[in-house]
């Protein structure tokens, strides 16, 4: 016997092929750059469930949703451009499985990393390994509703977006904290470990049916207000030491994705891993922000420039007073995350840019395959 939700999905699956072909399904994995509210449902110090977060997010009328920015994430913007009727809901939201086949699901979690121990100081978070396990549970639900063959066909056409790795590197560059710290690994060992674990999770997602993957490289973390303050970097400059760690990881990731494409496409030509070059995109934006119509790439729009970097609404403030006056002109929303304005610029480039932006081709081309 079908439940009410299952009946809805059976009916949905019987709709015309034209409607199905035009739909956009996205399964999103990652950290706070793409978290849309999973951390609202766990005990964690990494939350964005209070004002002024979400102040410019129209679907919630400016109320916080758990997004770590003032408006839309890059995944939100890409989804809209490719025809999504609404963003994939957070996996941990009650009854969220009812959206699995229609829109996909968002498994991302603020403070999460590729490595399980990343984000330990924030207490609660959902590491990538656990996010993939949660997708496996979602897949079991799909099979119950539309069968194994229907699930395989749906997943073959769905997008799998992975945006993670920043927290692993941010944890690495932070000063050691007594009782929580261990001897730091050599940089190349950290990078190799990140790539190895991420590759393992990507292969697992492929085994579960994923065929269209967008793997986002780590951005220039040496340019975010947090890292610049930590390293006493003056305005207009970035920490080259931090960015060097990021570049080394990204280069190894690119090599791994090329290997995956060669290996897995020989088994199934539908398989494609796209590398999204967020590093060069965001670095160009930070260093040339005025060319993009922005006015500030140094200070966060909300919260302090020095510890504790908190972005919150004071007791006698409204949401607008807690943030900068013109949010559409800032690159950074808080000390760690970009504004919707910056996300728009990066998302548009990833959608339609050339091979310097996304390789072997851009996201729109991948979606149309």
Swiss-Prot record:
One example GO MF annotation: hydrolase activity, acting on ester bonds
Biological process (GO) annotations held by this record are: lipid catabolic process
Residues in the active site? 32, 334, 337
Superkingdom to which the source organism belongs: Eukaryota
Q: Any idea which UniProt keywords this protein has?
A: Hydrolase, Lipid degradation, Lipid metabolism
Q: Which EC numbers does the record give?
A: 3.1.1.-
Family per UniProt?
Belongs to the 'GDSL' lipolytic enzyme family.
User: What protein is this chain from?
Assistant: GDSL esterase/lipase At5g41890
